[in-house]
């Protein structure tokens, strides 16, 4: 993924990109995959060259090698030595059951537990699941007015900071046809009251919409972000529409 991505970007952007990892492993993979890129081993960001620089992680035998790479990237970002970092797909076993995935891990490192947002971004539309990588039978108990308020307020703030405009946010209900607004439904107890409060905060939010009929062209042109109640509710239609043309941004 790294070599393929670097091969496709322009020369000016290549100068701003470097890899964090074990130089020998990366060099070996480069050769095996037959990519014609020139690598340069560095031990400090001051050693940048015109080649593809690899910030060398010496001890790749450590069990936490991948986490070490992530932690270094995170530390550089916090110190504002880099603008950001991109991680390749990560085997969740490295978290040893302590975290559901990268979103939660980064949240913990930033003292923002339970406030993390996993936004799957495409320039045409982004989606955000209120709950991330949890079992379906745990979803209902993880929905609350407070969580909806926190997540959408944070989403609105960070989206504006990243893309320099105020997003139009659509929110889906949890149940089929929003449970026809049954008084004991999550829509009536949590989602609708949260949306009323958010509108009073001047956040451009609408819903709840029934998930089964939301994802068609007319609706997609109206909104920048769709917030669903659980992972597959928004990621399944999103990946079908955009054919994996997206990136996962942790907010």
Identify the residue ranges that each predicted region occupies:
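Anion-binding alpha/beta catalytic cores of soluble intermediary-metabolism enzymes, centered on
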Residues: 1-251
């Amino acid at each position: 993924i790294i070599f393929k991505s670097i091969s496709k970007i322009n020369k000016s952007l290549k100068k701003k990109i470097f890899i964090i990892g074990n130089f020998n492993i990366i060099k070996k993979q480069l050769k095996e995959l037959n990519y014609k890129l020139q690598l340069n081993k560095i031990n400090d960001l001051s050693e940048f060259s015109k080649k593809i620089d690899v910030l060398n992680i010496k001890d790749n035998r450590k069990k936490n090698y991948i986490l070490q790479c992530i932690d270094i990237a995170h530390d550089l970002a916090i110190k504002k030595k880099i603008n950001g970092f991109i991680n390749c797909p990560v085997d969740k076993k490295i978290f040893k059951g302590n975290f559901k995935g990268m979103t939660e891990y980064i949240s913990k490192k930033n003292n923002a537990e339970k406030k993390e947002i996993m936004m799957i971004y495409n320039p045409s539309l982004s989606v955000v699941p209120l709950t991330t990588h949890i079992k379906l039978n745990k979803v209902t108990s993880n929905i609350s007015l407070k969580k909806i308020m926190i997540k959408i307020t944070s989403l609105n703030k960070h989206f504006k900071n990243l893309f320099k405009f105020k997003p139009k946010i659509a929110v889906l209900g949890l149940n089929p046809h929003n449970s026809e607004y049954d008084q004991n439904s999550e829509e009536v107890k949590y989602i609708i009251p949260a949306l009323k409060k958010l509108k009073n905060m001047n956040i451009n939010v609408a819903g709840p919409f029934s998930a089964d009929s939301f994802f068609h062209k007319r609706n997609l042109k109206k909104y920048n972000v769709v917030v669903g109640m659980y992972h597959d509710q928004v990621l399944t239609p999103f990946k079908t529409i955009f054919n994996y043309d997206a990136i996962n941004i942790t907010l």
